[in-house]
């Protein structure tokens, strides 16, 4: 392959397959600085067989405003290809897969994806790319390019040209691992497996950028590349398909691209130095390839995708005595599209370090593709645990902290009233029991709901991140108090707080945890008293419902079960069990979702539909919890795999009345119901008796009745909400959440 002078890219690979043209620029308008990443991709085509599919994507970063946004435009061929891949996928959790197929079957695309109004055109020699009049890329006849994007909310018109002798394009063929979406499709935004790449030198850009309602006349520099070949659907052989890449232009004229395959996803944020390959270009065009190390730093978890990305990296290239730290302008520069719903980081970044012992600075792009296929929805949701723990640590720090303790005690307006000794006592009594209980965080799905409800309405949840702590602390406080009232010695496999700290301390600390929301609202909604009032009203209703549910729990359902067994009428018993489940589980989940909707500015009809849906989700979750109890309840373990959280039929063994047992009253012969109930009623049945009772509940259809009820609850309430909210990846995941609540096991 011979590189041609000028900016225009090389011809396509005759092998066919994905073909991608990609640009990245740093642009300035006076003191304002922007980053632009733009890609035009063709997936398949005549050379590779099958119908052509096209996608045009761009993302803009506004450095001073710390805002990132963009658009993705696809043709019907791309939609059809994605639908086929999703339908054939057997790796992604079926609940997520069905939710995406449901969206696509309605002719809807999750934002930021949009359907091109007209067919795309891709012509070579001379280059002429047209994405339905939305995106145009053409040669200008003088070795440069004209690129234009006319989106609904953003766009640009730029002339790109070589900067002169120092900017001669130079070619090298690189190999990058495949980047695939959740359905297995190659991402047009990422290096393609075994894809030859023409890497152009720096390009100059001049033109107009439209973003967030304003236009800027910009100039700047950047680069383009063209990658082609590889497989759209790579083999799933268990290999880590993630990758990271830093591309930097230094102020001494050198350019650097360092690439690492694998190890890009680290949910715990632990940095590790990994082997990488660096390709450098000297100011006079000499190309140097050398071994390097790359260490990810400053982890940030996206509340949209729950990916954890390093937002900075340290690069070392010993051969050239180069040490460089590259840091993103700001963390939230994540890109998501229908061809890569797992998400990826495309962060414009600054770099500084030394080369040959001399200081150097630069700017460029830091990219991370974590390849997080959602193979297990529950494990995916559980990724929010790390964020939840961080936010809890801010409210309940491990060591006594005057500011947090005065807030906790309600004396922030007069902090001098609490001296050192008092602060020590407050920390031991109020913080200790809560941190003890949260050390074994569960699924944290309530925290997930609190953020997902905001995203559902197209609002960025990042400014409201502290709400995840309030959601979890509400649950934690109730667990601490419930364990005292139920005389439970264990919680999440650890001694309960009252066993360690005493009942009086535990009850007080658990109750105090309910007020975490007050502290959080003062931070995230400091200037909106009316909105805070509505949030408080919802939250106080949640607290009332929780105490009502615990009252029913303490009273128990034994007498109601006795009566149902004698009369053969299960309806009153079922209503009673459902009431307890609604008050203790559904009402809090509904309230947390409603708080998210209020924060997002949802309309009244949206607010009502969301409340009904989360009523159903919470009740379905507790019904499926009762079903899971019969089979042994597990949860994703932090170190991988799953760990048991309940023994098989633990509730049945304790003589508790659950939904399967209540449904069995109408499904088993009266004599068998009586035998089963009185065998477990007093909580002293042996293992064989409990196992036989659990088997009877499965065989008589009681479990099927529960799963059917849970499924119907969710399906009946999801469609009205779905039709009222924007079609986004948050809405796809919200549909999957309902399916998960109704059926917790992965099929």
Where do the model's predicted regions map?
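Transmembrane helix-loop-helix
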Residues: 521-540, 676-677
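Short, contiguous, pocket-lining structural segments
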Residues: 195-201, 212, 236-240, 505, ...
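Short hairpin/turn module used for nucleic-acid contact or packing/dimerization
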Residues: 327-393, 703-747
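Structured soluble/peripheral alpha/beta segments that form catalytic or ligand/cofactor-binding pockets
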Residues: 1-184, 189, 193-375
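Acidic, Mg2+-coordinating active-site segments of isoprenoid diphosphate-utilizing enzymes
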Residues: 455, 480-500, 513, 518, ...
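Aromatic-rich carbohydrate-recognition surfaces in CAZymes
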Residues: 111, 503-516, 520-521
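Conserved N-terminal diphosphate/IPP-binding helix and adjacent helical/loop segment
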Residues: 375-474, 480, 484-499, 554-571, ...
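Alpha-helical phosphate/pyrophosphate-handling elements in metalloenzyme active cores
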Residues: 419-470, 516, 521, 574-617, ...
């Amino acid at each position: 392959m011979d590189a041609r002078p000028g900016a225009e890219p090389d011809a396509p690979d005759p092998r066919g397959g994905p073909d991608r043209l990609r640009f990245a620029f740093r642009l300035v308008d006076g003191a304002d600085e922007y980053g632009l990443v733009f890609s035009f991709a063709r997936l398949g085509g005549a050379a590779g067989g099958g119908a052509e599919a096209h996608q045009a994507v761009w993302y803009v970063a506004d450095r001073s405003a710390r805002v990132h946004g963009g658009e993705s435009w696809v043709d019907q061929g791309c939609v059809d290809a994605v639908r086929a891949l999703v339908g054939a996928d057997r790796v992604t959790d079926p609940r997520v897969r069905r939710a995406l197929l449901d969206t696509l079957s309605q002719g809807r695309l999750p934002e930021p994806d949009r359907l091109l109004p007209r067919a795309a055109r891709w012509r070579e020699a001379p280059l002429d790319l047209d994405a339905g009049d939305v995106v145009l890329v053409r040669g200008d006849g003088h070795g440069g390019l004209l690129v234009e994007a006319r989106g609904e909310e953003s766009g640009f018109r730029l002339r790109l040209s070589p900067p002169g002798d120092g900017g001669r394009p130079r070619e090298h063929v690189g190999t990058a691992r495949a980047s695939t979406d959740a359905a297995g499709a190659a991402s047009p935004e990422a290096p393609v497996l075994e894809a030859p790449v023409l890497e152009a030198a720096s390009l100059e850009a001049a033109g107009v950028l439209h973003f967030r309602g304003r236009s800027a006349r910009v100039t700047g520099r950047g680069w383009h590349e063209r990658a082609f070949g590889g497989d759209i659907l790579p083999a799933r052989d268990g290999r880590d398909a993630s990758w990271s890449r830093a591309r930097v232009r230094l102020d001494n004229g050198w350019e650097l691209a360092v690439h690492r395959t694998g190890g890009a996803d680290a949910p715990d944020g632990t940095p590790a130095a990994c082997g990488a390959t660096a390709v450098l270009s000297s100011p006079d065009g000499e190309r140097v390839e050398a071994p390097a190390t790359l260490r990810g730093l400053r982890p940030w978890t996206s509340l949209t995708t729950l990916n954890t990305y390093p937002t900075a990296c340290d690069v070392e290239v010993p051969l050239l005595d180069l040490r460089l730290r590259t840091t993103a302008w700001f963390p939230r520069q994540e890109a998501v599209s229908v061809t890569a719903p797992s998400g990826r980081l495309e962060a414009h970044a600054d770099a500084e370090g030394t080369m040959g012992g001399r200081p150097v600075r630069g700017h460029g792009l830091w990219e991370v593709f974590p390849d997080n296929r959602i193979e297990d929805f529950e494990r995916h949701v559980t990724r929010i645990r790390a964020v939840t723990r961080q936010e809890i640590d801010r409210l309940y720090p491990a060591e006594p902290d005057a500011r947090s303790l005065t807030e906790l005690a309600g004396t922030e307006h007069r902090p001098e009233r609490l001296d050192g000794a008092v602060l020590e006592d407050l920390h031991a009594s109020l913080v200790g029991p809560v941190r003890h209980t949260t050390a074994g965080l569960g699924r944290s799905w309530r925290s997930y709901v609190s953020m997902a409800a905001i995203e559902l309405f197209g609002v960025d949840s990042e400014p409201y991140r502290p709400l995840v702590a309030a959601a979890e602390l509400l649950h934690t406080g109730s667990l601490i108090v419930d364990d005292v009232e139920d005389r439970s010695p264990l919680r999440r496999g650890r001694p309960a707080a009252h066993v360690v700290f005493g009942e009086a301390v535990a009850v007080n600390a658990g109750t105090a945890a309910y007020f975490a929301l007050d502290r959080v609202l003062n931070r995230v909604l400091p200037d909106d008293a009316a909105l805070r009032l509505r949030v408080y009203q919802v939250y106080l209703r949640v607290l009332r419902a929780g105490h009502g549910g615990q009252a029913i729990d303490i009273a128990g359902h034994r007498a109601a079960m006795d009566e149902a067994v004698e009369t053969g009428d299960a309806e009153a018993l079922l209503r009673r069990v459902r009431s307890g489940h609604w008050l203790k589980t559904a009402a809090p989940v509904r309230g947390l979702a409603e708080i998210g909707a209020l924060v997002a500015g949802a309309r009244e009809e949206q607010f009502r539909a969301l409340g009904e849906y989360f009523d159903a989700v919470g009740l379905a979750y507790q019904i499926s919890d009762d079903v899971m109890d019969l089979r042994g309840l597990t949860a994703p373990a932090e170190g991988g795999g799953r760990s048991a959280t309940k023994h098989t039929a633990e509730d049945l063994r304790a003589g508790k009345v659950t939904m399967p047992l209540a449904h069995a009253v109408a499904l088993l012969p009266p004599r068998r119901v009586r035998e089963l109930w009185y065998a477990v009623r007093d909580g002293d049945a042996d293992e064989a008796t409990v196992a036989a009772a659990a088997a009877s509940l499965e065989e008589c259809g009681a479990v099927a009745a529960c799963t059917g009820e849970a499924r119907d609850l969710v399906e009946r309430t999801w469609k009205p909400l779905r039709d009222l909210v924007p079609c986004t990846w948050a809405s796809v995941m919200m549909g999957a959440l309902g399916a998960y609540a109704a059926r917790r096991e992965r099929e």
